[in-house]
């Protein structure tokens, strides 16, 4: 078969890289479940109507067609067609509505699954990738304290990954109500448009954002400057945040008795609570950063972006926020708050920038040698004895020369080679020699019994190193 060409944006990890990815997945799952989150998996496809509900553009959605239907897709409206999910929030909202009678609320769920997004591939950005999400969904209402809990859970999970070379992570938080109230206080009406342009600040810079605010959102130059001044505000505690925000409102004539300020103050109070409570539990893990906008229009409260120290070019590696209107059933709403890690992007950084790597490809600690094919059943019995005792074991694929079998083990990183007992050559009725096992790293070879032998725990363990 001819060698297939790679497809841009669809990564395939080598076995050693997959070990790193799996370790990241296992670590995240452990932390999520430690905090009471329940794992689910949803289907890969949703209706076009569901996918477009989140504000995503149709050009970013991969639609499905049977081969014989190619060329006739226009006969079916996009809302009725099936597409691959581009995130895990849309599937979650549909899942909650469909299964609400079987779920306990608030519903705390974790989900680690592939998603597909039709965007231009570039370094660290893929068209097929794994996301890791946590969300809490309420029935009717959802207490604000979850807006503190979720970013702290994510920080805890990312902190665990520092053992594999990940730098320290800091969550930058804002609140949509704060931003919206300020923009309305300035006299701006296209709040969603302003948020979308502010969300581009790190990518295109302040001058270009100011131009877009005036050209596409109807802002005057003074209003655009005020929006950028708000985006410059950061604070590490609630009192500092309130003082800076009130001073900015006063300088732009936003009265404290106005409806706009009242709305902004609601968001400010929630954001101050998040920063202060996070500081009491994990100092420095969450800061207020008023340029965080999250361009998707379904967020209604807190919004988050997460950055790694010394990795500015990577951008945000974990984002999310509060959404009150994404899922509903009749008159009943299911508000939620969630955060999502681009896991494939994170793994790519850990592999190529942080130097994370597996100490060996194979999970097996032992390779049982095979002297000849007639002895394979005996080799398999030894392997099964070791496996029954929890020792990961493989058997040599062929009865090749011993040197080739050892080279095979070395290529896979298997540290021990087991030599089954063999009858001494020559003398009739000679007693079989005993089993022996060799550490091919140190060269040490000792007599061994598969019912009692124990490998060195450090040597036997498949690990991720930096």
UniProtKB/Swiss-Prot annotation:
Assembly and interaction partners: Homodimer.
Lineage: Bacteria, Bacillati, Actinomycetota, Actinomycetes, Bifidobacteriales
PROSITE patterns tied to this protein: AA_TRNA_LIGASE_II
Organism: Bifidobacterium longum subsp. infantis (strain ATCC 15697 / DSM 20088 / JCM 1222 / NCTC 11817 / S12)
Name of the protein described by the UniProt record: Histidine--tRNA ligase
Keywords assigned: Aminoacyl-tRNA synthetase, ATP-binding, Cytoplasm, Ligase, Nucleotide-binding, Protein biosynthesis
Record keyword Ligase present: yes
E.C. code: 6.1.1.21
Compartment annotation: Cytoplasm
Family membership: Belongs to the class-II aminoacyl-tRNA synthetase family.
Single GO MF descriptor: ATP binding
